[in-house]
Amino acid sequence: MKKLLIVSIMFLCFSYSKKEFIVSIEQPYEKKLDGLKLEIFLDKKKVKETNLKANNIMPSYETFDMYTSNEGKHLLEVKLKDTVFGYDVKYPEEKYIIVGPYLKKNGKIQMGILKQKEGFIFH
């Protein structure tokens, strides 16, 4: 009986899998974006706060995990300065996400996003 209980507890522990989004923040090339605070929210909850580090030599990324309790559609919000960019993301169809801030020619900030089911390969 003890063995059955232990096996069932182990099965429950291993069968429980955390649902997570893998998010990579592309660091900007523009020096005007250096040092700006970037905040990321998932379903209105803050999950990440970081400062951008401009780099004009080669692309660099800051990667982190965001956990969610259920599958389906979620709201991903990226706040940079006083602008909030909102995106619908679906778990598990869009598990891997890259966000990247850019400056338009008129000086306004634009946020780019890539979403896909499989992981990105960075060279």
Regions found by a protein language model. Give the residues of each.
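A short, solvent-exposed beta-strand micro-motif common in secreted/extracellular proteins
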Residues: 70-82
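Short beta-strand/loop motifs in extracellular/secreted proteins, especially
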Residues: 34-38, 74-76
